[in-house]
């Protein structure tokens, strides 16, 4: 790594961290890449799951974190679940959702296919795949046209409402019915329930985020919460259900190429000065590369060295052949993991790693 750094500079090095480690490990890994390699080319698996959600949340509410824990469902009157199958993928969260439904909360479950959680739903919504934006915009249309929004909350906390009104004007449920496959009357019914409930919360998974229009999907959900005032109170909020056990913590800790810990931009000079003072060295002033861009750069001989901790891009990358070609072209690859992964076959150096039960904290 030092030879590459001295010969080519930090831009020819990168790191791929883990969403399965602790917050402290995520923080230390991104700090190591930024401090030792002198680059912001550090990422983790959020790029393959909820990066679109983080982008929309940063844009919409100023933070890439969930605005409420899944335990908030216990206080909710209306729970909306879309693009997720909590019983299979988030069983603890699913328990809270089912208990809330049993206590009388309205449960709206959106999915192109039937799922087990629909047994508890007051309103199961089966729609055509890929039509999320059309369906969600029709909900926004109903809420705005029927004046079900929270005008006081909008005046105090929301920008761009009039622009949103114009955007969704042509997305009536009647026009969208053929596209989404959901009847106009049904859309109006569950839109009214979501808007009129005192406390509504939205949960979504990678069925929302893993799309070419994933950010737009998330924007629609954020808009639904904001215009109805269902953010910032107990039993309300926005909760993207993460893919691995600590994607949220790793993101919060700065394991992302464009932000430091707490989602502070690497291009903000005041923020950068703060971290330079704390870490005792000058830092890269430019955004780093995402793992997708990193793989392309490696194939094009623009990155020579990579440190992978607790990740397995040889298996997790959507284009495995491309990822494996990239890994094979690296001049130096270090892999740190609890297991001998497919990625480790390409490594020049393999470091051990502790599994969760082996850690003291």
Language model segments and positions:
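Catalytic alpha/large subunits of respiratory electron-transfer oxidoreductases
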Residues: 1-359
């Amino acid at each position: 790594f030092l030879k590459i750094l001295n010969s080519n500079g930090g831009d020819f090095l990168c790191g791929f961290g883990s969403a399965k480690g602790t917050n402290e490990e995520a923080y230390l890994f991104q700090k190591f890449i930024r401090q030792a390699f002198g680059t912001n080319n550090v990422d983790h698996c959020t790029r393959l799951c909820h990066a679109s959600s983080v982008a929309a949340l940063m844009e919409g509410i100023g933070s890439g974190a969930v605005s409420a824990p899944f335990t908030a469902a216990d206080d909710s009157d209306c729970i909306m679940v879309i693009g997720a199958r909590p019983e299979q993928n988030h069983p603890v969260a699913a328990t809270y959702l089912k208990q809330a439904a049993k206590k009388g909360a309205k449960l709206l479950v959106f999915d192109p296919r039937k799922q087990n959680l629909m047994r508890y739903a007051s309103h199961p919504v089966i729609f055509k795949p890929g039509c999320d934006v059309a369906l969600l915009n029709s909900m926004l249309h109903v809420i705005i046209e029927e004046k079900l929004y929270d005008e006081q909350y909008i005046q105090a906390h929301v920008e761009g409402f009039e622009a949103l009104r114009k955007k969704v004007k042509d997305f009536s449920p009647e026009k969208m019915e053929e596209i989404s496959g959901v009847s106009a009357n049904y859309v109006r019914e569950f839109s009214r329930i979501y808007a009129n409930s005192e406390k509504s919360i939205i949960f979504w998974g990678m069925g929302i985020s893993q799309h070419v229009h994933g950010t737009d999907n998330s924007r629609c959900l954020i808009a639904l919460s904001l215009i109805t005032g269902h953010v910032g109170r107990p039993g309300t909020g926005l909760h993207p259900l993460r893919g691995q056990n600590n994607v949220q913590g790793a993101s919060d800790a700065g394991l992302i190429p464009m932000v430091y810990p707490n989602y502070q931009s690497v291009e903000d000079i005041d923020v950068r000065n703060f971290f330079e003072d704390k870490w005792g060295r000058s830092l890269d002033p430019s955004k780093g590369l995402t793992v997708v861009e990193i793989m392309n750069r490696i194939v094009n001989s623009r990155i020579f060295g990579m440190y992978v901790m607790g990740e397995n891009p040889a298996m997790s990358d959507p284009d495995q052949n491309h990822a494996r070609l990239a890994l094979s072209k690296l001049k130096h690859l270090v892999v740190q993991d609890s297991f001998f992964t497919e990625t480790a076959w390409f490594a020049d150096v393999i470091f051990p790693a502790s599994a969760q039960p082996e850690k003291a904290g």
